[in-house]
Amino acid sequence: MQPVLKRKLKLLLTICVISSISGVIYQLVDADHIDFRSIYLGLNLGLSFGVLELFILDRYQQQFQKLPFFWHLVIKSILYTIIILIVAGPIVLLLELREGGDISGFWNDLFSPGFYSIIVYALIMYTLLVFYMQVNRMVGEGVLIKFLWGRYYKPVEEERVFMFLDMKSSTTVAERLGHQKYYALLDEFYHEISIPVLKNKAEIYQYVGDEVVFTWKTKTGIKNLHCIQIFFDIMERLEQRQEKYHDKYGLVPEFKAGVHFGDVITAKIGDLKRVIVYNGDVMNTTARIQEFCNHYNCKLLISGSLLDKLELDETYSASFIDTVKPRGKETELDLHCVTKKY
């Protein structure tokens, strides 16, 4: 199953569960009892909302991102109001007929204060869900839930793999395109990497200009060679879309990357702006490894210590390049260039 589809189906299931539970809570507060109607209505509303949000409106995500966040919420709230009315009406009719009622009873229910209180309740709930999903996108996949659960409020030492991915000849590209078009190129590229990121279970730590930093817990990063496969998946997507980049920007961006692993201190810092940061020697070392890519004419350089942890299959080739002492470091480091055979 494709990683994006798998992620969407998981989200859809979560939305349906939350919606059903919300229906039960509403009925408990309103009627002091529970029956299947609250679950049935909540499940169908959640399913409709999830399909609309994840499979229909998601196709227009880039257009929505151009809107101010407020108008993004307003437009979607209007759409959800329409969908809720379309879905809730037939369900109320079905329940009315099932319980021996008739059309007149349906119309009475449809224009009753109780029906509209359900609509308002559902609209508020789904607007909050959209708000959460959009904020989650803004701060980074999975980061918001870590804040909500208080993870990393106290510093934690953990072992992680890092990849520093950087555009080659970025200064030349920026001068050629101009600042506006250059950042449009970067934004388009950062959208391109979504599928490789999900497929290889990477976390996007930060964007720094034309550089993006990926991270994994070591166990996740080395499993199925995620920490190197992501690079080749990204390059493959660029190759598949090279004609589009040529037509739009007159070039196809090229990237280089350095990968290393080690211990870091992970913690939440800040007051007015709170972020989760990683602090450790591995960060500087990985950045230095990436800087050697141009010198050794290699697109993907990894440390010898990381290579020892990886079980490369016949798909990949790792060639020893050199033993170096990165700038500002006392210990030497073996560098290996990784290529993909096919």
Language model features with spans:
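Membrane-anchoring hydrophobic segments
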Residues: 1-40
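Generic alpha-helical transmembrane segments
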Residues: 15-19, 37-58
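Hydrophobic transmembrane alpha-helices
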Residues: 52-61, 69-113
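Regulatory cytosolic signal-relay segments
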Residues: 97-158
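Catalytic NTP-binding/metal-coordinating core of nucleotidyl cyclase/transferase enzymes
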Residues: 155-229
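Catalytic core of nucleotidyl cyclases, primarily class III adenylyl/guanylyl cyclases
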Residues: 200-226, 242-281
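Catalytic/regulatory signature loops of cyclic-dinucleotide turnover enzymes
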Residues: 260, 281-304
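Cytosolic regulatory/linker segments at or just downstream of nucleotide-handling modules
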Residues: 295-342
